[in-house]
């Protein structure tokens, strides 16, 4: 059975970032999205290496996707057809697109967000029964109730 771990890093241009915290950020503070962008860039190679290492321990393929011609074409098409969709959301749709494409070659697929650092030697593919379908870690206990979301919070986390 063919197995793969994949991740991707799309360095969204600063001009396209969705500054969701602009109404609540303290004066002089770095917006969350910009800080995240900076930290991901600063730790880019370490974040790739830890995922490669995990895949190697499991004996599975690892594929890293980045801001390449395929993504540029995908984004261009998306912008043409859905101009109101933000770059951040296009990146999330691309994640699903990649999953679909990888499913043509691989039986079992693990997607890791770029900021995830595997901290176990246990095989995800042995621990989770993927024959039952998609595995999603549920964390709704950490979500804010809708009445606690304000125009200044803009998020459920």
Predicted regions and their residues:
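N-terminal anchoring/stem segment of glycosyltransferases
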Residues: 1-94, 104-105
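Conserved beta strand-loop-helix elements of the APE1-like EEP
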Residues: 156-157
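GT-A fold catalytic core of metal-dependent nucleotide-sugar glycosyltransferases
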Residues: 86-153
């Amino acid at each position: 059975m063919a197995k793969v771990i994949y991740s991707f890093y799309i360095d969204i241009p600063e001009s396209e970032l969705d500054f969701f915290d602009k109404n609540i950020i303290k004066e002089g503070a770095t917006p969350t999205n910009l800080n995240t962008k900076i930290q991901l860039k600063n730790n880019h190679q370490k974040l790739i290496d830890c995922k490669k290492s995990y895949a190697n321990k499991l004996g599975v393929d690892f594929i890293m996707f980045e801001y390449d011609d395929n993504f540029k074409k995908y984004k261009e098409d998306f912008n043409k057809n859905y101009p109101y969709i933000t770059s951040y959301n296009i990146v999330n749709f691309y994640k699903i697109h990649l999953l679909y494409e990888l499913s043509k070659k691989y039986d079992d697929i693990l997607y890791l967000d770029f900021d995830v650092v595997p901290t176990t030697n246990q095989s995800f593919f042995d621990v989770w029964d993927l024959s039952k379908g998609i595995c999603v870690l549920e964390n709704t206990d950490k979500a804010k109730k809708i009445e606690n979301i304000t125009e200044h919070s803009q998020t459920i986390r």
